């Protein structure tokens, strides 16, 4: 990696956790990812969710149809696990190169997850098949019992779901997505080579004070929710250490402004336009820019068993102001860090 003080040249990154939605929203947001990233793991929580090979093929084509000319971008599709999913369908999709991974949403944990899994036991035949064929499991790691505090749901998931699952299926490859706690950072660091994690820019840059002190900031509201500063610091220390089983996953999750700024707002940060520069800022603050390229462009492909990208991009260190909003057909999108001045941005 070449790192003069004002320019960072890195191998083209990938986004290992991304929501692109569908319809007009899809057309609006895809270019913000496809101009920067070579590949992205695309989340399957549409309505209805992507649970068949045919649905994934059709969705992949809708994505590709929106990629601007000149962008070299490959969407990596995922299967939404449900209690009734046929293991043979999953294996067929994996063998045919349609499904790269499968996603476990605990029922009602996040946006469009009402079809999610009610218990791990309900999908054990599917998970056993995934272990057998080497298909990665992507996990939204929160329990959803009504009596468990929202700030405790990730830590409780580790002890009640994740660890028993990994003890039972020892060869299963697992990505603990968008980790937000010291508990999860320690768990992944102490795990073996079959356990990895993604971290979002918002969980590295902010904690719950930023979202709640001096007024509620709905555009920082995402799930898993921002935690206290000791957890934020643990995540920052994990990425700054150069640990090779943690990698870039923005969890960019667009919602129209009126669905965020409401009396019952949706969870999700649309960070695709600003994520890479945000990560660079964090690595610079942690004096860890020497590990930035691996986090963005190497660790993910290594875990998935895929080649790294063979092209490069540059980030420049110069102050730029983020747009206040982005036009949608009948509304607007508010990007992560809207209206703020950022230090790093992708060179156009």
Curated annotation (Swiss-Prot):
Assembly, per entry: Homodimer.
Name of the protein this chain belongs to: Dihydroorotase
This protein's record includes keyword Zinc: yes
A GO MF label: dihydroorotase activity
PANTHER family tied to this protein: DIHYDROOROTASE
Species the sequence originates in: Escherichia coli O7:K1 (strain IAI39 / ExPEC)
Binding site for Zn(2+) 1: 17, 19, 103, 251
Position of the signal peptide: none
């Amino acid at each position: 990696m070449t790192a003069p003080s004002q320019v960072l040249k890195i191998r083209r990154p990938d986004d290992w956790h991304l929501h692109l939605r569908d319809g007009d929203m899809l057309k609006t947001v895809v270019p913000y990812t496809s101009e920067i990233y070579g590949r992205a793991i695309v989340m399957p929580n549409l309505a209805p969710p992507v649970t068949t090979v045919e649905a994934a093929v059709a969705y992949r084509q809708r994505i590709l149809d929106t990629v601007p000319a000149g962008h070299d971008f490959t969407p990596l599709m995922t299967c939404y696990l449900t209690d009734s999913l046929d293991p043979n369908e999953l294996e067929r999709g994996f063998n045919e190169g349609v499904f790269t991974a499968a996603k476990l949403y605990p029922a009602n944990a996040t946006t469009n997850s009402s079809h999610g899994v009610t218990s791990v036991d309900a999908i054990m035949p599917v998970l056993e098949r995934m272990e057998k064929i080497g298909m990665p499991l992507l996990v939204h790691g929160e329990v959803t019992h009504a009596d468990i505090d929202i700030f405790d749901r990730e830590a409780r998931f580790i002890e009640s779901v994740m660890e028993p699952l990994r003890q039972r299926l020892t060869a299963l490859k697992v990505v603990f997505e968008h980790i937000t706690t010291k508990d999860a950072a320690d768990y992944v660091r102490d795990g073996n080579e079959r356990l990895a994690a993604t971290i979002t820019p918002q969980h590295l840059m902010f904690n719950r004070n930023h979202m709640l002190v001096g007024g509620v900031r709905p555009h920082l509201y995402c799930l898993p929710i921002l935690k206290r500063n000791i957890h934020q610091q643990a995540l920052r220390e994990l990425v700054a250490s150069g640990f090779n089983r943690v990698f870039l996953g923005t969890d960019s999750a667009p919602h129209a402004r009126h669905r965020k700024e409401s009396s019952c707002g949706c969870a999700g940060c649309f960070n695709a336009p600003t994520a890479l520069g945000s990560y660079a800022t964090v690595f610079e603050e942690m004096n860890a820019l020497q590990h930035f390229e691996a986090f963005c462009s190497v660790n993910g492909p290594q875990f998935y068993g895929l080649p790294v990208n063979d092209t490069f991009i540059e980030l420049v260190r110069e102050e730029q102001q983020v747009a206040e909003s982005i036009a949608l057909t009948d509304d607007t999108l508010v990007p992560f860090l809207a209206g703020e001045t950022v230090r790093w941005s992708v060179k156009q």
